[in-house]
Swiss-Prot record:
It comes from Arabidopsis thaliana (Mouse-ear cress). Residues 1-13 have a biased composition (Polar residues). It is found in: Plastid, Chloroplast. GO terms for biological process: amino acid biosynthetic process; aromatic amino acid family biosynthetic process; chorismate biosynthetic process; response to wounding. This is Phospho-2-dehydro-3-deoxyheptonate aldolase 1, chloroplastic. The keyword Aminoacyl-tRNA synthetase does not apply. SUPFAM superfamilies: Aldolase. Induction: By pathogen infection and wounding. PANTHER family: PHOSPHO-2-DEHYDRO-3-DEOXYHEPTONATE ALDOLASE 1, 2, PHOSPHO-2-DEHYDRO-3-DEOXYHEPTONATE ALDOLASE 1, CHLOROPLASTIC. The keyword Transit peptide applies. Its EC number is 2.5.1.54. Pathway: Metabolic intermediate biosynthesis; chorismate biosynthesis; chorismate from D-erythrose 4-phosphate and phosphoenolpyruvate: step 1/7. GO terms for molecular function: 3-deoxy-7-phosphoheptulonate synthase activity. The gene is DHS1. InterPro entries: Aldolase_TIM, DAHP_synth_2.
Length: 525
C-alpha cells in the first residue's frame, strides 16, 4: 500500500514558549505551561502560505486573509492556544494532562508525511473527476469493541465497495477509513440528564467514558495514550491486510458475487457483478495474473475529525524532507461543522499542517464564508489539499449546494466535493433510538450527483458512517431493517451506522449511476 513510501521525520519540533499572555476567553482547561520557560527555539516556523506548496493557478478572494487575525498570526504547532477553542474537554488536573502530552510527544508518528502527500495527490485527481473518494468507518471508535475481527470486517466491506465503484466509474477509488483515530466527538449539549441526574456529555473514548456515572464522565487525559496505542495497532493490522493478500481483487470479487446471490435484489446487481468477474478473466488472459502486485495489494489511508487539539499537537512533527509540519495522527483530518469558525482554534491549527484537510459543511454554511475558509486553509490553491464534505439532507442539497459550488468556482479555488449523506438524515425512532433511513441516505447521494451534473462540476466521492458488522442501526435496505429490529443489534457508541449489506447495496447503486453517466445513459430513477 502507499503506506510504504514514508518520508523521514525529524524528532519533535514544537517549541516551548511562554503563552501566559494568551487571551482570557480561551478555555481554561488547556492552561498548561512548559516545564522550562525559555525563548522559542530556532525552528522553521510555518505560516499559512508555507503549509501548502504554491500552485500554478494561485488566486485570491475578495477579502485577503492576510488582513484577518488568522493571517496576521505567525503559525506554530501551538499557536491555536491563542484562539478560542470550542468542544474541548475541561481536564481537572493540568499537571497530569501535561505529563500525558509529553509522553505522546515522545511516541513515534502513527503515519508518515510521504503517505499524506500521496493521498493529497490522489485527492487532486478526484477534484477533476479522475478518481473517486470512498471514505468510511465508525461514527466513533471505541475501546470496548476494539478487536481484529471488527477491523477486518469494515476493511473488507470498503474493499468490496471500492471494486464495485471502480468498475462503475472506470476511475481509481481512493480508500480512506474513518479508522485508527476516530474517537473524539463534538456534542450539541455539554451535559446530558437522566432521571434528574445531570452529567457531562460523553465526548468519545479518548476523552471520557460512556457509562452514565460521575466518575466515567470526568475527562481523563490517560485515555489519549490508550487511543494512541489502539490507533497504532489498528493501522498495523490494516497495513497487513492491504499488502498481505487479503485485499486480492479476485478474492474481493468473489465476496461480491456471494453478496449478490444472497441479495433480495439479485437481478439488479448480478449484471454488474458478472461484468467485474469477466473483466478479471480478460486481465488474466492478457497476462496480468492473480499473483501480480496490482492484483493482490491496495492503498489504504486513515482519517478522523481534528477535534482534540492537545492530542493532535502532540503528534505534529516537522518533516525533514519537505520542511513542513504534518499531523502524524492520520493521513487526513477534517474540521467539523461545530469547530470551523474562521477565527477559532481548530482552523488556526489546521492552516499550518500540510496534511490533506476536510471541511464539513451543512446547509448553514454561507457561500462566501466557505470561500474565506478555503482561502485560510489553502492560500496557495493547491489541488488535493481541501475536500469539502457536504452534509445537509437531500432537499437542502438541491437548494444550497449549487450556490456553494458557484461561489468556489468564481473564486478560482480547487476543492474536492464529497457527499456525507449520514448527518443530515438522523431521526428518532418510536422506541427512542437514533436512526437513519437508507432511502433518505440514498436520496441525498442522488441529489449530490444530480447537482454536480447540472453545475458541470465533479462529484468527488462519498463519506459514510458504516461498519462491517451486521448491526441494526439504520432502517431500510434490501434486507429490510425495521423500527422493531433496531434494538436487536444496536451497538453504536454515538450515531447509527450502515451495516455491511446496506453499505454494499449503496455502492452498487452509486456504481450503476456512475456507469450510466459515463456512458451517457439516462439517469437512474
Amino acid at each position: 500500500m502507499a503506506l510504504s513510501n514514508a518520508s523521514s521525520l525529524s524528532t519533535r519540533s514544537i517549541y516551548g514558549g511562554d503563552l501566559s499572555h494568551r487571551p482570557s476567553n480561551r478555555q481554561s482547561s488547556f492552561t498548561f505551561h512548559p516545564a522550562v520557560n525559555t525563548k522559542p527555539k530556532s525552528v522553521n516556523l510555518v505560516t499559512a502560505v508555507h503549509a501548502a506548496e504554491p500552485a500554478r493557478n494561485a488566486v485570491s478572494v475578495k477579502e485577503s486573509v492576510a488582513s484577518s487575525s488568522s493571517g496576521a498570526l505567525k503559525w506554530t504547532p501551538e499557536s491555536w492556544k491563542l484562539k478560542k477553542a470550542l468542544q474541548l474537554p475541561d481536564y481537572p488536573n493540568a499537571n497530569e494532562l501535561e505529563s500525558v502530552l509529553k509522553t505522546i510527544e515522545a511516541f513515534p508518528p502513527i503515519v508518515f508525511a510521504g503517505e499524506a502527500r500521496n493521498l493529497e495527490e490522489r485527492l487532486a485527481d478526484a477534484a477533476v473527476g479522475k478518481a473517486f473518494l470512498l471514505q468510511g468507518g465508525d461514527c466513533a471508535e471505541s475501546f470496548k469493541e476494539f478487536n481484529a475481527t471488527n477491523i477486518r470486517d469494515t476493511f473488507r466491506v470498503l474493499l468490496q465497495m471500492s471494486i464495485v465503484l471502480t468498475f462503475g466509474g472506470q476511475v481509481p477509488v481512493i480508500k480512506v477509513g474513518r479508522m485508527a483515530g476516530q474517537f473524539a466527538k463534538p456534542r450539541s449539549d455539554a451535559f446530558e440528564e437522566k432521571d434528574g441526574v445531570k452529567l457531562p456529555s460523553y465526548k468519545g473514548d479518548n476523552i471520557n467514558g460512556d457509562t452514565f456515572d460521575e466518575k466515567s464522565r470526568i475527562p481523563d487525559p490517560n485515555r489519549m495514550i490508550r487511543a494512541y496505542t489502539q490507533s497504532a495497532a489498528t493501522l498495523n493490522l490494516l497495513r497487513a491486510f492491504a499488502t498481505g493478500g487479503y485485499a486480492a481483487i479476485q478474492r474481493v470479487t468473489q465476496w461480491n458475487l456471494d453478496f449478490v446471490e444472497q441479495s433480495e435484489q439479485a437481478d439488479r446487481y448480478q449484471e454488474l457483478a458478472n461484468r467485474v468477474d469477466e473483466a478479471l478473466g480478460f486481465m488474466s488472459a492478457c497476462g496480468l495474473g492473480t499473483d501480480h502486485p496490482l492484483m493482490t495489494t491496495t492503498d489504504f489511508y486513515t482519517s478522523h475529525e481534528c477535534l482534540l487539539l492537545p492530542y493532535e499537537q502532540s503528534l505534529t512533527r516537522l518533516d525533514s524532507t519537505s520542511g513542513l509540519y504534518y499531523d502524524c495522527s492520520a493521513h487526513m483530518v477534517w474540521c467539523g461543522e461545530r469547530t470551523r469558525q474562521l477565527d477559532g482554534a481548530h482552523v488556526e491549527f489546521l492552516r499550518g499542517i500540510a496534511n490533506p484537510l476536510g471541511i464539513k459543511v451543512s446547509n448553514k454554511m454561507d457561500p462566501f464564508e466557505l470561500v474565506k475558509l478555503v482561502e485560510i486553509l489553502n492560500p496557495n490553491n493547491k489541488p488535493g489539499r481541501i475536500t469539502v464534505i457536504v452534509r445537509m439532507g437531500a432537499e437542502n442539497m438541491r437548494v444550497k449546494l449549487p450556490h456553494l459550488i458557484r461561489a468556489v468556482r468564481r473564486s478560482g479555488q480547487i476543492v474536492t466535493w464529497v457527499c456525507d449523506p449520514m448527518h443530515g438524515n438522523t431521526i428518532k425512532a418510536p422506541c427512542g433510538l437514533k436512526t437513519r433511513a437508507f432511502d433518505s441516505i440514498l436520496a441525498e447521494v442522488r441529489a449530490f450527483l444530480d447537482v454536480h451534473e447540472q453545475e458541470g462540476s465533479h462529484a468527488g466521492g462519498i463519506h459514510l458512517e458504516m461498519t462491517g458488522q451486521n448491526v441494526t442501526e439504520c432502517i431500510g435496505g434490501s434486507r429490510t431493517v425495521t423500527y422493531d429490529d433496531l434494538s436487536s443489534r444496536y451497538h453504536t457508541h454515538c450515531d447509527p451506522r450502515l451495516n455491511a449489506s446496506q453499505s454494499l447495496e449503496l455502492a452498487f447503486i452509486v456504481a450503476e449511476r456512475l456507469r450510466k453517466r459515463r456512458t451517457g445513459s439516462q439517469r437512474v430513477s
